A protein has these predicted regions:
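Positively charged n-region of N-terminal signal peptides that target proteins for export
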Residues: 1-4
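Bacterial N-terminal signal peptides
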Residues: 9-20
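Exported/periplasmic ABC-transporter solute-binding proteins
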Residues: 22-24, 28-69, 76-84, 93-94, ...
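Short acidic (Asp/Glu) patches
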Residues: 104-110
Length: 269
């Protein structure tokens, strides 16, 4: 009877040990590799750079086996969510990135990671076929031309910088007299451009013609009146994927990333 008891105890001990050994250790569970297909790199920014950013994100995501999620549009539409889960923030101008860091997204951006990616030039978009025969800023300063501009987002003061670049005050005055509406952002300007055909000219960046080629022809501004603003990107302080975020930013400046941005109207460095 005693022998049977000892055998039973030993059997229980052996089974317990086997059960313990069959379970992965807590350390092993902690260090187990993450399934890449579940990784999402969340990236937020304005609508202007979005077409190029989305295409580049798709290529990078396929190469890495992850998803790069691009949320773009006017800042108020995404800033609250970005404060909760953004890994990266991209901008449509240098002052926009500064506004993000100092005002719109307080404490979110790691300012040491901000980098400038690409520039795009200012341009005049006209109705298909250019019925008014617009050739540049001189023409849009003349009476009888109705202009749409953006006074916000990445274009604060853009029209004034363009019109006044050569120091001709009459040209600035002429352009101002012809402005029919100051849109708060490019998205609102695009809606008005497509719905109100009384506008002859949309003073904007070249990239918007690439984004919607059927709605406008591109007329380059005279070199002496052309200005440039940038797209930049930065990693957030809250991101748990900083290394991956840096890899994506690096990719945007790679040969493949550059080709994508050039395709969408941005300038190669």
């Amino acid at each position: 009877m005693k022998q049977k008891g000892i055998t039973l105890v030993l059997s229980i001990i052996v089974l317990t040990c086997l059960a313990i050994l069959s379970q992965p250790s807590a350390r092993a569970q902690e260090t187990a590799p993450t399934d890449k297909t579940s990784i999402v790199l969340r990236t937020y920014g304005p609508g202007g750079p979005a077409p190029a950013m989305r295409e580049a994100a798709k290529v990078f995501g396929e190469r890495k086996g992850i998803k790069v999620e691009i949320t773009a549009g006017p800042t108020p539409t995404w800033k609250d969510q970005a404060m909760k889960d953004a890994d990266l923030i991209f901008s449509g101008s240098e002052y926009m990135m500064t506004d993000f860091a100092q005002k719109d997204l307080p404490g979110l951006i790691d300012t040491s990671t901000i980098r400038t990616l690409y520039l795009r030039p200012s341009a005049t978009l006209v109705r298909p076929g250019n019925p008014k025969g617009i050739k540049g800023i001189r023409d849009i300063a003349k009476p009888g031309v109705r202009i749409l501009v953006v006074q916000g987002a990445g274009q604060v003061g853009m029209w004034e910088d363009v019109a006044g670049r050569t120091g001709n005050v009459k040209r600035v005055d002429g352009v101002r007299r012809n402005i029919g509406f100051f849109a708060p952002n490019s998205a609102e300007a695009k809606k008005l451009w497509t719905s109100d055909l009384t506008y002859d000219v949309w003073l904007i960046w070249t990239i918007w013609q690439k984004e919607s080629p059927a709605s406008a022809d591109l007329i380059n501004i005279e070199p002496e009146n052309t200005i440039y603003r940038s797209c930049g990107i930065a990693i957030t302080n809250r991101s748990e994927r900083k290394v991956l975020g840096k890899e994506f930013a690096d990719f945007l400046q790679s040969t493949a990333g550059q080709a994508t941005f050039v395709k969408w109207g941005w300038m190669a460095p």
